[in-house]
């Protein structure tokens, strides 16, 4: 083994061990002492400083700035991966507000085998739950394996997407190539860009060919099928990504701008049409009432979420600008270097795509239920990324071969530094220690729920799991028939979308005291307003769900530490007027 390889092993070993120690400090039991970002940055700064010194001492050829950037990216990537690990555990209870719902929705694809009845397919994120359903092929796998599978999906799909994108850049320097891969990984997670959405663009990243437009059209259609099954606002994204590659790689030449635009227009119209047809087809096939899919268009818009607020202290607009301005700076410098040597139609094409996705992302972020991060700006951030790296690495094809201007190297490095630091800080600010209840508490909680459910079901009473329905999915609560209606997350969607017919049926069943037992999160009848995170969501849920339920049902048992509340019908004299 040569000396340089020995050095590489020393550097690799140090970075791996030290970054794992850093992750363990923030995510382990002592992480509760370092919840504030400032303390996390101080700890990170200490590790990074030592690592840069070791890198310089071990490999003197490294200049300080590249060594600093590489070090930041390595720590960020390993920490981001480490944040997934506390979620891989065997606790039967939901780890986040929506996690248990996700496993229940995934089980819908195998509902006959699991519950003995067929239930409606998922309304929310069908493709995510389709991917999450794969482990259900093997019956009775423990929940920790299902959790491991989703972590694998996050890392595998994101990694494949990044690999295909970076491959298009033809970066010959191996170290630079891996550095870019690591940076794009951090960039994607600042949204985050969800893995099940990325699958729709993988065909375009893999096979876009400016010289084979028919093949590209087929790839756009394939991606659009998946996009149509995934989310309404991602229907045009495969076509828009192909159009972005087209504007970056294909000259206008002598064809004229009308003929030039015809190709991306065909892709766009065809892709959106296919995605829309698939979405309509799934709505009909899923078993859901068609009106349920309309809630995405009737939800209230909370424009204040675009500015700093209790739900998202940074505000969607400011955080999006923060995440995107470094790349805009790099793009502006590269365009200046080229003498803006791209036809105005190509400028407008990319600009209009970015503007449409930016405005669309802001509108979706303002919908009630959203606005707590910038994940709805994912498509905007994606196209911006592609544009930036194509220009920076010289993959964009200018319309003529004018000499390049002198680069603003120092200014470019400043923008690159911020492009690394901003997603790194957003990454380090995520992830907290996950302290699970003791095994005895978990067993007692399950025993309590089982006893109350058995008693309620003894006389053919219905047991409604508003929350924690995955306890039935994974057999933690046994011999209790599934009541498929009114799962909490779907119920919240109907509340936020003001689906009056759905909510009227729910209220009628509650008034009729149709359920012998309701298992829910602790219900509160207090309005909280916008001074608390997700205050608007709380208030509509209180008005449409909590108050009607508490009027006709009374809590009989609170299962603390999880938290879970068991409710039974009130006696006639106790029902509110």
Question: Which role fits each region the language model picked out?
Answer:
Residues 369-413:
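Hydrophobic/aromatic-rich transmembrane helices and adjacent perimembrane loops
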Residues 23, 79-134, 141-155, 185-196, ...:
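Transmembrane catalytic cores of multi-pass membrane glycosyltransferases
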Residues 1, 7-8, 71-73, 265-269, ...:
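Signature aromatic-anchored transmembrane alpha helix within multi-pass, membrane-resident enzymes
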Residues 281-287, 422-575:
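Extracytoplasmic
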Residues 1-83:
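Start-transfer (signal-anchor) and selected internal transmembrane alpha helices
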Residues 46-51, 157-165, 199-211, 222, ...:
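Transmembrane alpha-helical segments
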Residues 148-181:
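Transmembrane-helix motifs of polytopic, lipid-linked glycan transferases
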Residues 55-67, 166-175, 208-214, 250-260, ...:
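Membrane-interface helix-boundary motifs at transmembrane edges
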């Amino acid at each position: 083994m040569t000396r340089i390889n020995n050095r590489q092993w020393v550097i690799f070993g140090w970075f791996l061990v030290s970054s794992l120690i850093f992750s363990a400090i923030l995510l382990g039991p002592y992480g509760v002492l370092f919840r504030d970002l400032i303390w996390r940055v101080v700890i990170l700064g200490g590790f990074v400083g030592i690592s840069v010194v070791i890198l310089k001492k071990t490999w003197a050829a490294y200049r300080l700035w590249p060594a600093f950037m590489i070090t930041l990216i390595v720590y960020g990537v390993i920490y981001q991966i480490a944040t997934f690990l506390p979620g891989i555990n065997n606790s039967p209870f939901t780890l986040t507000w929506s996690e248990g719902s996700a496993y229940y929705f995934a089980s819908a694809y195998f509902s006959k085998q699991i519950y003995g009845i067929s239930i409606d397919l998922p309304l929310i994120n069908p493709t995510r739950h389709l991917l999450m359903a794969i482990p259900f092929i093997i019956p009775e796998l423990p929940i920790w394996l299902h959790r491991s599978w989703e972590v694998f999906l996050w890392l595998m799909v994101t990694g494949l997407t990044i690999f295909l994108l970076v491959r298009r850049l033809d970066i010959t320097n191996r170290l630079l190539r891996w550095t870019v891969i690591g940076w794009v990984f951090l960039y994607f997670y600042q949204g985050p860009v969800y893995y099940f959405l990325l699958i729709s663009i993988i065909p375009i990243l893999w096979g876009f060919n400016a010289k084979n437009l028919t093949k590209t059209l087929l790839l756009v259609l394939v991606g659009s099928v998946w996009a149509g099954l995934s989310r309404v606002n991602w229907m045009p994204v495969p076509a828009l990504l192909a159009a972005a590659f087209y504007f970056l790689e294909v000259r206008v030449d002598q064809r004229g701008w009308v003929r030039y635009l015809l190709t991306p227009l065909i892709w766009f119209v065809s892709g959106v049409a296919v995605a829309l047809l698939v979405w309509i087809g799934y709505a009909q096939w899923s078993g859901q009432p068609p009106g349920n899919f309309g809630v995405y268009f009737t939800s209230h818009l909370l424009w204040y979420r675009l500015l700093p607020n209790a739900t998202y202290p940074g505000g969607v607009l400011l955080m999006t600008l923060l995440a995107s301005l470094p790349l805009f700076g790099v793009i502006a410098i590269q365009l200046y270097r080229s003498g803006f040597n791209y036809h105005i139609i190509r400028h407008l094409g990319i600009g209009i795509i970015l503007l449409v996705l930016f405005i669309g992302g802001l509108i979706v972020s303002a919908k009630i239920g959203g606005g707590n991060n910038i994940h709805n700006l994912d498509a905007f951030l994606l196209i911006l990324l592609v544009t930036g790296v194509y220009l920076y690495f010289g993959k964009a094809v200018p319309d003529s071969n004018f000499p390049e201007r002198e680069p603003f190297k120092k200014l470019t490095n400043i923008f690159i530094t911020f492009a690394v630091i901003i997603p790194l800080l957003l990454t380090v600010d995520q992830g907290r220690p996950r302290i699970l209840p003791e095994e005895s508490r978990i067993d007692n909680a399950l025993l309590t729920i089982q006893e109350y459910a058995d008693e309620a079901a003894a006389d053919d009473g219905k047991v409604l799991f508003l929350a924690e329905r995955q306890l039935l999915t994974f057999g933690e609560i046994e011999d209790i028939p599934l009541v498929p209606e009114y799962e909490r997350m779907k119920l919240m969607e109907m509340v936020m979308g003001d689906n009056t017919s759905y909510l009227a049926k729910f209220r009628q069943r509650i008034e009729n005291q149709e359920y012998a037992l309701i298992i829910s999160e602790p219900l509160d009848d207090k309005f909280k307003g916008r001074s608390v995170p997700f205050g608007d969501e709380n208030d509509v849920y209180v008005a449409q769900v909590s108050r009607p339920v508490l009027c006709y049902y009374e809590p009989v048992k609170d299962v603390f530490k999880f938290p879970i509340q068991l409710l039974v019908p009130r006696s006639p004299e106790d029902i509110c007027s």
